[in-house]
Regions:
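A post-motif C-terminal structural segment
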Residues: 25-26, 35-88, 113, 143-469
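Structural beta-sheet core signal
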Residues: 29-30, 136, 346
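Bacterial N-terminal signal peptides
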Residues: 9-17
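Bacterial N-terminal signal peptides that target proteins for export
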Residues: 1-9
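Glycine-rich phosphate/pyrophosphate-binding loops
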Residues: 119, 124, 129-149
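His/Cys-centered metal/cofactor-coordination and adjacent catalytic loops
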Residues: 102-117
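Substrate-binding/charge-relay-adjacent region of secreted/lumenal peptidase catalytic domains
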Residues: 97-100, 174
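Sec/Tat signal peptide C-region and signal peptidase I cleavage site
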Residues: 18-24
Length: 469
């Protein structure tokens, strides 16, 4: 794969020769997992209503970015995509199959031998080769599809730790995602990694420090956290909020923070976490403080991974409050960076089946019931029942007999919106998602774009920075 990396660096040089005014010292990619356009709209209204406004007129931080595009999200083998195929397009510049990560579309899912011959370099790896600082921040497991797409190359996104690897794959030399992060052969590896998923790095004999009844997941008996700490000087590991907050702002080493055995808490539940967790905005600010110390610039991936999970559970409240956490993180990044040196892109990997419907009056609570529906339904229709503005096309919220919501608080955090089709979990949706861009080279985000084009926009901005001597 090394030759492919040098090839991309050469392409970066070509971009520089053609357009020397579009290069940025830094690139920050914010990824709202599952943050379709209906999610952005609903979150915008919710944010406004939380401020005492009707809501519709409010603007999220990234709503104010000047450059906006629609992004086509399909995988090469799927009309409605998954996060592995989409993040590969975004971070490696090629659309690929559903379920594979960092490998080309010629690799069937689960085919280790084929994957070893068809790895795709990622923008994080290219940034490391170019001498830039790199970071990954996520509220999901750091080995999950989106953060994993920054550094891993596997034919199955589920190969997150050694116990998930088939025997044949082990024999052929395929490595699990957690191990690939620890052994990343490009540069010195990411300078900042903050998220969930510490069980993926811990041996099955080791109890979790926060939940002693939970054990690590690795069956190869390796403690990857200890190995990572031992492999270089100036490395620091944290797993709770107190340790995170104690990290000195002037710290120049590499930082690993794994705050949960699996995914981090939803933003709505974060304050109740036993060990304490930093917010997405706090992790973003920490990462920016560390990465900005590199005079060559940096690449940072920030994922709000639990937006997706809230939708899968049919729980709009948690999906939207996690979207607001992403909004706060974007605002923090805008405040902390120079637009003349930094490209910021905000997008989603795919959408969800969330709908905004009915004819609610202006300012009606977005999580509430449609308050004007009765005037639009014939009085002869005795079967009319209240319904919510937000709903899902499918998922866990299906009711064989439609319930009477008259006395139900649909704005409650645990309320599950009604779904039209019964499924064990709500699915992704296939419509285009939005991309918002600001700063240097943001004009490359425009029109209707194939998802893999985002990689090329970011690469054009990041490599061959004209301020570099």
């Amino acid at each position: 794969m090394k030759s492919k990396i040098y090839s991309w660096l050469a392409i970066g040089g070509l971009f520089a020769a053609l357009a020397t005014d579009v290069h940025a010292k830094n690139v920050i990619l914010f990824l709202g997992d599952g943050m379709g356009i209906s999610t952005v709209t609903a979150a915008r209204i919710l944010a406004g209503q939380l401020k005492g406004m009707p809501g519709e007129e409010h603007a999220l931080s990234f709503d104010q970015f000047e450059h906006v595009s629609l992004i086509k999200t399909y995988n090469t083998d799927a009309q409605v995509p998954d996060s592995a195929g989409t993040i590969t397009a975004i971070l490696s510049g090629e659309k690929t199959r559903m379920g594979v990560l960092g490998v080309s579309a010629s690799v069937p899912r689960g085919d280790c031998a084929s994957s070893l011959e068809h790895e795709l370099p990622t923008i994080l790896e290219l940034a490391e080769e170019a001498g830039k600082a790199t970071g990954i921040v996520s509220t999901a497991r750091i080995t999950h599809a989106t953060p994993g797409g920054a550094y891993a190359h596997v034919p199955d996104r589920d190969w997150e730790n050694s116990s998930t690897l088939p025997a044949e794959a082990r024999a052929l030399g395929c490595k699990d995602i957690a191990l690939q992060l620890i052994e990343l052969p490009h540069g010195d590896g990411p300078d900042v990694v903050l998220g969930g998923g510490r069980a993926q790095f811990m041996p099955s004999s080791a109890p979790d420090p926060e939940y002693p009844d939970k054990m690590g997941l690795r069956d190869d008996h390796r403690d990857l956290i200890s190995e990572w700490l031992d492999n270089a000087k100036s490395r620091h590991y944290v797993w709770n909020a107190e340790q995170f907050q104690a990290v000195d702002a002037s710290f120049t080493g590499q930082l690993l923070g794994l705050f949960e055995p699996s995914h981090m808490q939803f933003e709505a539940d974060r304050s109740q976490d036993p060990g304490g967790e930093p917010s997405l905005a706090e992790m973003t600010k920490m990462a920016l403080g560390r990465l900005s110390q590199n005079k060559e610039g940096f690449f940072l991936l920030v994922e709000a991974g639990r937006i997706d999970h809230g939708h899968h559970f049919g729980n709009a409240y948690r999906a939207l409050t996690d979207t607001l956490a992403l909004d706060a993180a974007v605002a923090a990044a805008v405040s902390a960076t120079d637009p003349e040196q930094t490209l910021i892109v905000v997008t989603a990997d795919h959408s969800h089946t969330l709908t905004i419907s009915g004819y609610p009056t202006r300012g009606n609570p977005i999580l509430g019931k449609v308050n004007q529906a009765a005037s639009l339904v014939s009085q002869a229709n005795s079967k009319y029942l209240p319904y919510t503005t937000l709903g899902y096309a499918n998922g866990l919220g299906y009711k064989a007999v439609y319930p009477d919501l008259t006395d139900v608080d649909t704005t409650a955090p645990d309320y599950q919106q009604i779904a039209a089709v019964p499924l064990p979990m709500e699915t992704h949706a296939g419509e285009d998602v939005a991309a918002f861009a600001a700063g240097k080279a943001a004009h490359g985000v425009k029109g209707v774009m194939e998802q893999d084009r985002l990689f090329h926009v970011m690469m054009q901005a990041l490599i061959n920075d004209p301020t570099k001597d």
